[in-house]
Amino acid sequence: MANATIATLIEDFHATVLPAHLKRMVDRDLSLGTPFDPAPGNLVKVVVGMRRSGKTYRLFQQIRDLLNSGIKPEQICCFNFDDDRLRPFTASTIDEVLETFFELHPSSRSQGTFLFFDEIQEVPNWDIAARRIVDTEKITMYVTGSSSRMLSTDVATEFRGRSIAYELLPFSFREYARYHHVLEDRQGMFDKEQQSLLKRACRDYLVQGGFPGVQMLDDNERAGVLQSYAQFTVARDVVERHGFSNAAFARNLARVSLASSGRDFSISKIDGMSRSAGYSPGRATISAIIDAFEDAHLLHQVYEFTHSAQKVRLGGFKVYAEDPGLLCALAPATSDGLTRALETAVYLEMRRRASSRVGSIALLKHI
């Protein structure tokens, strides 16, 4: 028999939740590819990225596109597991959601269903239930999550080659301009006034960054919120997940790393500075923490170009923040701050366009 709370959440989505969000949604440029026709054994499409980067809204955009293509609303089940009314979760919670949906819309079992599970990692053993559903039901599944249990390396492990991961970064400059309605009705070439408007918008973007939730805040509010994003990511997705013993060191290392976005980065130098300050966990642990930052989508490491896969990590490297706004929120004001924010934005745009191959973006210091 249908769970009343689950049934209410399922029905409320199409009645009130989706219409309300569509009114203020800004289209993202990340493509999730052509939707698979519902069938057993489909690959799961997983949207990964840093917390607060807009993953849920990207699911809403996909749902809107499906509806516009002629898919019936009763063939779409979108469910957010981050709801206190669902707690405590059990091993059967995901099954209850699916069975309740089919009780509400029986024909969807044979016609095929598009499942959108948001924050699915809140449910214990979610991966076991998700794999079984994918193998046995006529469905197409989209999944997203933002906790330490839903990071990029976990996706490959949980679905074992049966998923496609899509990385969603905060707003690009194009998306930022779209959000702020900068020259959205432009046609033809830019005149001088339009060029000036774009230059001003670009400068603002490099300082404010592209996290959707901070776009309408003033400078002080935005800096505080962005700092909280970074601190919470370190606490949940790095310290808690990996069990690093010194949380204060990890927080400070995150601040130093993000503030160094676009600069040469040295593990040895960090180790030396830490020892001078009275504590260092050692180079190996520092390197492991930096890797954990990258896995949590807090920053990215870029190494010097080499033809040898074995030597990728032997040369120098730089780190780039997940968003130029993080650099400006965490770094002290310096003469090269805007320049490094621009370099960070360029790297992130290259990342949006590049393949996922190791070394597809590299440093070339000497020509």
Which residues make up each language-model segment?
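Accessory nucleic acid-recognition modules appended to NTPase machines
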Residues: 75, 219-367
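Interdomain motor-coupling "hinge/lid" segment immediately C-terminal to the ATP-binding subdomain
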Residues: 2-8, 154-263
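Hydrophobic anchor at the beta1->P-loop junction of P-loop NTPases
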Residues: 47
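N-terminal pre-Walker A segment at the start of P-loop NTPase domains
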Residues: 1-36
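Conserved glycine(s) of the Walker
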Residues: 54
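Short glycine-rich substrate-engagement loop in P-loop NTPases that contacts/grips substrate
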Residues: 77-110
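Hydrophobic positions on the alpha1 helix immediately C-terminal to the Walker A/P-loop
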Residues: 58
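Structural recognition of the conserved hydrophobic beta-strand(s) that form the central parallel beta-sheet
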Residues: 116, 140-146, 167
